[in-house]
């Protein structure tokens, strides 16, 4: 069995004396792991940095085997990631969530493209937090937990939508919320794609998407805690001037 594809490096760990096992998110084969022979060598180790865009060739005797990769660099994002605290925290959050959320060997070409585009924006701090929010919404949608923010779950109207139901993921208007308002999640305008937004508003929106990651996605994956990297990114965005 063999194939060739492009992929984003999500994680790398040492394997034996000279090899490494890498976890990747590929365009056509989904999240896929494999061994890189000589992965700790001076030639290959610098290539294997989280977020790197790689040309991957995978081979295994049987399809369900771990298999091995040969890798060639296409694009390093190390310089962009090291350009500032937001870029580094953002990269770590993206690759950690992809590793955490995605099942192995299940293709998600649309999310792959969205992830590639988001990582290519690293270092552009003025637009990155909002781009990340939109990516997180796409991640929830891909996993089957997408939010329906088009109309009120109670009235069906699309006016004055200011809350999200923590159970259904649907929007709720101010008038329909009534005495339940305190139990609902905030729906800031940026969560509905309504133009640019200040960072505090984006942080508020990320607390809402975080509820569904924590209380819907994580339980579906066996109640594992969300990656700490996401929490660190949210804390950083919350403190941006």
Swiss-Prot record:
GO BP of this protein: DNA recombination; double-strand break repair
Keyword Flavoprotein included in the entry's annotation: no
UniProt xrefs under Pfam families: RecO_C (PF02565), RecO_N (PF11967)
Keywords for this protein: DNA damage, DNA recombination, DNA repair
Gene Ontology annotations for the cellular component aspect, listed alphabetically: bacterial nucleoid
InterPro entries in UniProt: ARFGAP/RecO, DNA_rep/recomb_RecO_N, NA-bd_OB-fold, RecO, RecO_C
Role this protein plays: Involved in DNA repair and RecF pathway recombination.
Family per record: Belongs to the RecO family.
Protein name: DNA repair protein RecO
Provenance organism: Ruegeria pomeroyi (strain ATCC 700808 / DSM 15171 / DSS-3) (Silicibacter pomeroyi)
């Amino acid at each position: 069995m063999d194939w060739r594809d492009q992929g984003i490096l999500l994680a790398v760990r040492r394997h034996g004396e000279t090899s490494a096992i890498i976890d990747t998110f590929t365009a056509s084969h989904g999240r896929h792991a494999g061994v890189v022979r000589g992965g700790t060598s001076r030639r290959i180790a610098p290539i294997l940095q989280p977020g790197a865009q790689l040309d991957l060739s995978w081979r295994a005797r049987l399809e369900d085997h771990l298999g091995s990769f040969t890798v060639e660099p296409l694009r390093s994002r190390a310089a962009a990631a090291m350009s500032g605290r937001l870029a580094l925290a953002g990269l770590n959050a993206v690759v950690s969530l992809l590793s955490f959320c995605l099942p192995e060997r299940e293709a998600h070409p649309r999310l792959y493209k969205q992830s590639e585009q988001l990582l290519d924006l690293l270092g552009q701090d003025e637009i990155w937090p909002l781009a990340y929010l939109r990516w997180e919404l796409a991640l929830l949608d891909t996993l089957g937990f997408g939010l329906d923010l088009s109309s009120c779950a109670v009235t069906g109207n699309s006016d004055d939508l200011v809350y999200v139901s923590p159970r259904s993921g649907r929007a709720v208007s101010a008038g329909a919320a009534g005495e339940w308002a305190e139990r609902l999640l905030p729906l800031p305008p940026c969560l509905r794609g309504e133009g640019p937004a200040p960072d505090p508003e984006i942080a508020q929106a990320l607390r809402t998407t975080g509820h569904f990651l924590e209380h819907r996605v994580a339980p579906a994956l066996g109640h594992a805690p969300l990656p700490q990297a996401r929490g660190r990114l949210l804390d950083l965005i919350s403190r941006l001037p």
